[in-house]
């Protein structure tokens, strides 16, 4: 049943967002008859509603295509569609490790973008053969020759043989299939008779079948009825089904060397299936594990709280379900005096945060408040120990801290020349250090080192608005560096509000504090007593706004008469207000939290 190795091609498609990866995948499926016309829809592989609406791919998907080449031979092509967005670079790295070749899709009207570079370099690091595909050549603005030259200059791959296609209209799709067969290599030698060795590429949860595991067989044969063992976790399972995606699930009897397929094995927890783990047969194990991947580290943390405290258990259950599908999302319980019970969650980046929040709200009908996103700081304590700080509210006493280190990123920004000045100004405002500036035709490529803390809030939105949407941005974490950071607390009526505390750079503290106090002044309703709103760093107040009191006209009932009568009533009111101020609680509406946290860095 297994296909001979030299007739298998495992490949992935890498490209910048919106350059047409998923549409090309649709055409390849259509042309090879993976789905009939009735089942075809746009972006077949984007299975989540959010993926379709935003037009982005989040989870990597796989398809097995059968193709009869022009030389009369039958080939099996395994395609892995990868996400293009920087937050999901982890999904990309894992998909690339399961393949031997890549199609590099570049939009013929836009040329090379920042994420094109990041993903191509990952493919080259995995020793991939690369076939260049120029998409959207039917557009009037397409300039294939200029883009070819740009690919050669920027990436350094020979683009003379590039395949010209239009994934939307279907021009040139057959040429792509031929190029895959002729230019991409077959899987490296695999031995059918050796002990089973397979790489776990991905896993997700299905409510009927339990956990479905995507595997790439390297040696040996995987079939129904075997007992497999995960070498990393040591867990053992009997295999119930083996199969492939065409993109429908189709069961097969066995998976041989070089093939990509799925297995189900009554696994209840996705946590038991570590991505990059080696799967082997329990009876006859292989002695050497695969090198695997490094697990995804959360980069951005924020608190998620239900607007209605009664939804807490529902939120816990919903997060557990999302965790089954997304191993890079982590959470733990936390309580806040202002917001009640909730969770501290870790994400790969801001888009990841937004998507998880949106999925919780849509798929589970929850109303949520998110606190300001923060990054992981390292605290070097006076006693020589090192701590990680995920939540600014938990910061220990400043006296005990020797130094605070913050994560920095290496960012690559590609932009048309016209917006270069404004973008450099933005990077400098965010404490960026310029590393490099090169020109590729009319576009500039700038490399900056930036503190992640400054990027987390709204850097991406600002970049897009400054450049009218033309600039593209990609980053990877570089290292931790010492920074002059201080904890800013917000006091409302002289009570600290833990959900609004944040770590900021000393130079920006006053500006941020003032802006936040002004915002809260607009959002908190007036009470019967005066409310001060203060931003404090340690014991020093750096900004203050006051919400004036509402007052009842107590003297309205006095018609004329002695002035002492009026004075007595006013004094009595003053006493009451004083007492009220001492014991009164200021109610901060939920809306105020949401707005204040959205403020970011305006």
From Swiss-Prot:
Q: Where are the transmembrane segments?
A: none
What keywords were assigned to this record?
A: Cell inner membrane, Cell membrane, GTP-binding, Hydrolase, Membrane, Nucleotide-binding, Protein biosynthesis
Specify the tr-type G domain's residue ranges: 6-188
Binding residues annotated for GTP, in chain numbering: 18-23, 135-138
| Entry's Gene Ontology BP terms | positive regulation of translation
Per its UniProt record, what PANTHER family does this chain match?
TRANSLATION FACTOR GUF1 HOMOLOG, CHLOROPLASTIC, TRANSLATION FACTOR GUF1-RELATED
> What protein name is recorded for this chain?
Elongation factor 4
Q: Which organism is it from?
A: Brucella anthropi (strain ATCC 49188 / DSM 6882 / CCUG 24695 / JCM 21032 / LMG 3331 / NBRC 15819 / NCTC 12168 / Alc 37) (Ochrobactrum anthropi)
Encoded by which gene?
A: lepA
């Amino acid at each position: 049943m297994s296909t001979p190795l030299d007739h298998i091609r495992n490949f992935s498609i890498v490209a910048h967002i919106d350059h047409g990866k998923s549409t090309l995948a649709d055409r390849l499926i259509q042309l090879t008859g993976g789905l009939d016309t009735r089942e075809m829809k746009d972006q077949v592989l984007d299975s989540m509603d959010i993926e379709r609406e935003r037009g982005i791919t989040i989870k990597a998907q796989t398809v097995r295509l059968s193709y009869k080449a022009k030389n009369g031979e039958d080939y099996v092509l395994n395609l892995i569609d990868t996400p293009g967005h920087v937050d999901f670079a982890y999904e990309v790295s894992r998909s690339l490790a399961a393949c031997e070749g890549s199609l590099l899709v570049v939009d013929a009207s836009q040329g090379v973008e920042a994420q094109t570079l990041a993903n191509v370099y990952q493919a080259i690091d995995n020793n991939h053969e690369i076939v260049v595909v120029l998409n959207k050549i039917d557009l009037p603005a397409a300039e294939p020759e200029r883009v070819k030259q740009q690919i050669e200059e920027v990436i350094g791959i020979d683009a003379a043989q590039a395949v010209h296609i239009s994934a939307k209209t279907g021009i040139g799709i057959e040429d792509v299939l031929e190029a895959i067969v002729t230019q991409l290599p077959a899987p490296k030698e695999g031995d059918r008779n050796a002990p089973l060795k397979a790489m776990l590429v991905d896993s997700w949860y299905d409510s009927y079948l339990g956990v479905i595991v995507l595997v790439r067989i390297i040696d040996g044969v995987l079939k129904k009825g075997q007992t497999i063992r995960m070498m990393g976790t040591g867990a053992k399972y009997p295999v119930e089904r083996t199969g492939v995606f065409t993109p429908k699930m189709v069961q097969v009897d066995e998976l041989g060397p070089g093939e990509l397929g799925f297995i189900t094995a009554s696994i209840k927890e996705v946590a038991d299936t570590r991505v990059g783990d080696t799967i082997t047969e329990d009876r006859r194990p292989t002695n050497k594990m695969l090198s695997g991947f490094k697990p995804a580290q959360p980069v951005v943390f924020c608190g998620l709280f239900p607007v209605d405290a009664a939804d807490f258990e529902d939120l816990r259950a919903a997060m557990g379900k999302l965790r089954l599908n997304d191993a890079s999302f982590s959470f733990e319980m936390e309580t806040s005096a202002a917001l009640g019970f909730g969770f501290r969650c870790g994400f790969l980046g801001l888009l990841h945060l937004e998507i998880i929040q949106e999925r919780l709200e849509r798929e589970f009908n929850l109303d949520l408040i998110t606190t300001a996103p923060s990054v992981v700081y390292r605290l070097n304590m006076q006693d020589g120990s090192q701590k990680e700080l995920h939540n600014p509210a938990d910061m220990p006493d400043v006296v005990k801290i020797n130094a605070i280190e913050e994560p920095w990123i290496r960012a690559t920004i590609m932009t048309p020349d016209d917006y270069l000045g404004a973008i450099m100004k933005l990077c400098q405002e965010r404490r960026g250090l310029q590393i490099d500036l090169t020109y590729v035709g009319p576009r500039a490529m700038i490399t900056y080192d930036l503190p992640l803390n400054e990027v987390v809030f709204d850097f991406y939105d600002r970049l897009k608005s400054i450049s009218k949407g033309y600039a593209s941005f990609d980053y990877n974490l570089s290292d931790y560096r010492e920074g002059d950071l201080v904890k800013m607390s917000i006091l409302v009526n002289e009570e600290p509000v833990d959900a609004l505390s944040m770590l900021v750079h000393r130079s920006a503290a006053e500006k941020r504090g003032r802006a936040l106090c002004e915002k809260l002044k607009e959002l908190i309703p007036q009470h019967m007593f005066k409310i001060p709103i203060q931003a404090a760093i340690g014991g020093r107040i750096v900004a203050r706004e006051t919400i004036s009191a509402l007052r009842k006209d107590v003297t309205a009932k006095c018609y004329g008469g002695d002035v002492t009568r009026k004075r007595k009533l006013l004094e009595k009111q003053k006493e009451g207000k004083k007492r009220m101020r001492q014991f009164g609680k200021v109610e901060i509406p939920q809306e105020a939290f949401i707005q204040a946290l959205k403020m970011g860095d305006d």
